[in-house]
C-alpha cells in the first residue's frame, strides 16, 4: 500500500512544513485501518520535485507507462496505445476514478500474462533485483537495476 498524498493536492502549492507532516497523518490513518504504515508515495500530478525539496522522506514510485485512463478512454483505445510501450520492469499508471478502469486492468493483465510478463507488487519488483528503496528518491521502473532521480 502506498500513499497518494493526504489531500491529493499539488505539492507545488503546499508548504514544505505541511508536506513534511503528511507521512505521519497518512501512516496514522493506515495503521488504524490496515495495521501497517507505508514507506512510499505516488505523488499526485507527478510533481515529486517539491516533495524531494521539502525532504518529506518517502520513496516516490512514479510510472513508466501512462494509460491515460482518467481521460475516460475506452479499454480498446488504452490497450492499442499501451501495448507497444511495455518492457520488463515497467510501472503502469492507472486510476480508480473511471468506470472503465477495472475492466481495462483485467484485459491488460490478461494480455500481459499472454505476452509472458509476470505482474508484481512494487515491493516484489524492486526486491527481485535487490534494490532497497531510498527516501527522497524517485523510481520509475526496475529491471536489472533501477532508473531513479536522486535527491
Where would I find each of the regions flagged by the language model?
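Catalytic domains of cell-wall/extracellular-matrix polysaccharide-remodeling enzymes
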Residues: 2-140
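Structured C-terminal subdomain patch of bacterial secreted/periplasmic proteins
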Residues: 137-151
Amino acid at each position: 500500500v502506498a500513499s497518494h498524498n493526504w489531500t491529493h493536492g499539488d505539492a507545488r502549492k503546499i508548504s514544505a512544513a505541511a508536506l513534511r507532516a503528511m507521512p505521519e497523518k497518512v501512516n496514522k490513518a493506515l495503521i488504524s485501518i490496515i495495521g501497517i504504515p507505508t514507506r512510499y508515495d505516488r505523488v499526485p500530478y507527478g510533481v515529486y520535485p517539491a516533495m524531494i525539496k521539502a525532504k518529506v522522506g518517502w520513496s516516490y514510485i512514479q510510472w513508466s507507462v501512462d494509460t491515460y485512463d482518467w481521460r475516460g478512454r475506452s479499454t480498446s483505445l488504452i490497450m492499442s496505445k499501451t501495448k507497444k510501450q511495455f518492457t520488463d520492469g515497467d510501472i503502469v499508471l492507472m486510476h480508480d476514478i473511471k468506470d472503465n478502469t477495472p475492466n481495462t486492468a483485467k484485459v491488460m493483465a490478461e494480455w500481459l500474462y499472454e505476452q509472458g510478463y509476470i505482474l508484481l507488487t512494487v515491493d516484489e519488483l524492486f526486491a527481485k533485483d535487490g534494490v532497497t528503496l531510498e527516501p527522497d528518491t524517485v523510481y520509475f521502473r526496475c529491471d536489472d537495476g533501477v532508473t531513479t532521480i536522486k535527491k
